[in-house]
Amino acid sequence: LPVTPLAYYLGATVEIGTEQRLHADGESFALDGPKGFEATVARVLKQVFLLDCVTRTEGMYDVALYERELVESAVDLDFARLYDLPLAAQVSEYLQVPYDVLADAVPTWKLTADVVPDTAAVPVVPFLADELAVVRCPEGPGPAGESSTDLSPEVTSFFRSANGLVRSAAQRGESFARSTTRHSDGSDDLDQTVFTLQSADSIEQTYVGDGIPLGAGKMTVEEYYRRLDFDAASDGRTRVLVVCNDPEMSDENVVGDTYGTRDWIEFDISTHEGVTTDELAELLTTDADFLHYIGHVDPSGIRCADGHLDAETLDEVNVNAFLLNACQSYSQGRALVDAGAIGGIVTLTDVLNTTATEIGRSVARLLNQGFSLLSMLGLLEKRNLLAQRYMVVGDGNETLVESESGTPYAAAIDRLDAEEFEVSVDAFPTKSFPMGCIMRPHISGLNTYYVGSGRLDTYQLSQSELTDFLDMQRTPVLIDDRLCWSSEIRVSEI
């Protein structure tokens, strides 16, 4: 499994043999280096990809590429000559260079996929190859088979709310939680093990196998194949459904005004309050791009005005993606995906209403700017620990709209002195703008392009230059670990 994306990218054949090696143009390269087979294969994929990007600037992509500057300062390769060589000869010369020499120029990878090695998982291989994912094969839940009961007390308490940590909706107050039932152990009666995966140095991480991975999305074979059946709305309109089933949570209802605040994109936003089980079931069968649910989820299902709708009873769901912004909504969200949704965002534990409202608003704004489900949640987790109580089920590659910049990006800003600021820009590849796309931040005087994945660069800007950068488009900005928005920032107040 781990070698599939590399073989796909190179157009290579995979054969059974006694040694793990890559053969190219008469040369042979070991794939079982000191860091192990999986890590070595990942390094080879990244190295060949990087040097391919640089070599292609000799052809139709005649741009000033930042990665080329870094590579040329570290190695002596004749890229004009390499451009005219056959692929096998190119690969052979690429791999003569030690990876560590190029490491600083390798872009942050988009996706790491942890796939439990089982014949049932084989059908996901073509989809992972298409995304050029780094594929790893854990033997079971977590790097050492650790379950939630094996984790540290701090992590365990993350899933099992202690008495007094949150209040149920029956205890009305400023910090009531989005749950109407007090669970004795704080769990959602999950029938699968919650566990940790080995961390990944990629923007996104997904898992294929049994169990519920902490800090990663969860995909199944069926959900990958659902990508092939996706049919975009014929009229070109982006349809969003906002459902609020608790009047005390109406503060989050303003997300209906957030979706659709984009020029040149036609939206159809509808808001529904206090819906019944039949009405919610009908909404879920609607051909809509996104459902933003605000309310309660209990063991009986999604709370409605006349009872509970158990998503496991639904035969069909036509909403593409969703946010179930309620306590312990994993099981109901999993059922929505099983019934036909492409992907969604759910919670694994109780969430305070104030936290859920804040995250719900941020989700709306990030999706409205072209972020995928997984990249959006990863960005939120950087500045809000409680966002780690949320996870993606189904296809985390799903997006609501495309970014104005093509590849969406976020900026981090620090003031250096009265007139100068340090600005770091991070890019987040999507299904429409995947690994290999190039981009150029809108910074005055900058003519350099970058492979648009992860940290592009850090710039020193004057106050006027920073103002121009922030005015270019609405984008998320991190200031002192706070998530802000470029359209709301006064540079003089940073």
Language model: regions and residue ranges:
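Long, folded non-catalytic interaction modules
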Residues: 1-152, 158, 162
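Short, solvent-exposed amphipathic alpha-helical segments in soluble enzyme
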Residues: 4-10, 257-260, 338-341, 361-362
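Short hydrophobic alpha-helical runs that function as membrane-insertion/retention elements
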Residues: 13-15, 291-292, 343-347
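Short, surface-exposed amphipathic charged segments that create phosphate/polyanion-binding patches used
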Residues: 27-35, 284-289, 360-361
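Short, surface-exposed beta-strand/loop "edge" segments at domain boundaries and coil↔beta transitions
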Residues: 28-35, 250-251, 332-334
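A domain-level signal for caspase-like cysteine endopeptidase catalytic cores
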Residues: 111, 115-290
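Catalytic-core segments of thiol-dependent peptidases
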Residues: 243-247, 254-335, 477-479, 483-493
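Active-site-proximal C-terminal subdomain of hydrolase catalytic domains
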Residues: 320, 325-494
